[in-house]
Amino acid sequence: MKAIGIILAGGNNDGRLGVLTDHRAAAALPIGSCYRAIDFTLSNMSNSGIGKVAVLTQYNSRSLRDHLMSSKWWDFGRKQGGLFVFTPYTSNAGSTWFRGTADSIYQNMTFLKRSNEEYVVITSGDSVYKMDYRKVLEYHKESSTSPAPKEKAPASKYLSLKARN
């Protein structure tokens, strides 16, 4: 199943992690001796066969960018698609800082439109867990779950999902 990965790693965390994120993004927080929080999500993507991954960053992103650019642990070579890091930019079209997760994806819509993948897996970059996204995509494909609605929905800060066994 062809999928592209989007990792949301740009939030300012609204102070939920206190001084730990004063000078770095939550996704760049050290875990163990040589890992960062984002490494778990990147490993999940790689182990799920997702070879093209975009990391969307914003606040305090230097440490995260340095880590992503210096590591080749996840096997996102150009032949498989690659690892891309996007930050907000300004252009003649007047782009601004991301105004939330949906806006960060919207501002990078060109990247998605140019991809040939059938599915998009969107995850957080600061959560530590192990998951095979192929199983999630298979469930989505086999279930009666309909695609996300195309009509405009009211903006929300958080999204709640209920998991079924």
Where are these regions (language model features)?
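Unchanged
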Residues: 1-165
